């Protein structure tokens, strides 16, 4: 590896580390009523500003089951995601302003640049480790109940 390439790689690693070290995700408990009206609890990191939303799960390889990231906006709009710099396969679940399920993209492809979009305007987006939607039955009629 040339010294130029090594320098560039070092810079990228340092840059990503500095982003993560300065990012402070607040952890909260999320309560969802699933498709069978059963209550499911998740510990989520809240991404409620541009900086945190831009980081998401980028670079993370260890996402324990029952944990996730909840993206929150002040308004409803069509939301777009991609998996660039995200090494873990995820389920990405979109909810409307009232917390009702819109759609889910299951088992996303790590590092993919494919567009993952809500089918309707969304205010909340939940990212969980791949397979969680199926395991916890998070489909039609699922609803966010509470975030503490």
Residue ranges of predicted features:
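Bacterial N-terminal signal peptides that target proteins for export
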Residues: 1-8
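Low-complexity, intrinsically disordered regions enriched in charged/polar residues
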Residues: 9-10, 51
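Cleavable N-terminal signal peptides
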Residues: 10-11, 20-21
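Compact, glycine-rich, soluble single-domain proteins
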Residues: 22-148
């Amino acid at each position: 590896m040339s010294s130029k390439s090594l320098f560039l790689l070092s810079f990228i690693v340092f840059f990503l580390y500095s982003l993560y070290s300065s990012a402070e995700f607040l952890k909260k408990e999320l309560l969802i009523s699933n498709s069978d009206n059963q209550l499911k609890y998740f510990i989520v990191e809240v991404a409620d500003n541009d900086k945190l939303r831009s980081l998401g799960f980028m670079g993370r390889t260890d996402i324990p089951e029952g944990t996730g990231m909840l993206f929150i906006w002040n308004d409803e709009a069509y939301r777009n995601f991609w998996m660039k710099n995200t090494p873990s396969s995820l389920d990405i679940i979109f909810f409307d302003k009232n917390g009702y399920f819109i759609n889910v993209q299951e088992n996303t492809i790590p590092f993919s640049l494919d567009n993952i979009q809500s089918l309707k305007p969304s205010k909340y987006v939940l990212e969980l480790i791949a397979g969680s939607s199926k395991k916890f039955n998070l489909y039609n009629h699922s609803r966010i109940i509470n975030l503490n």
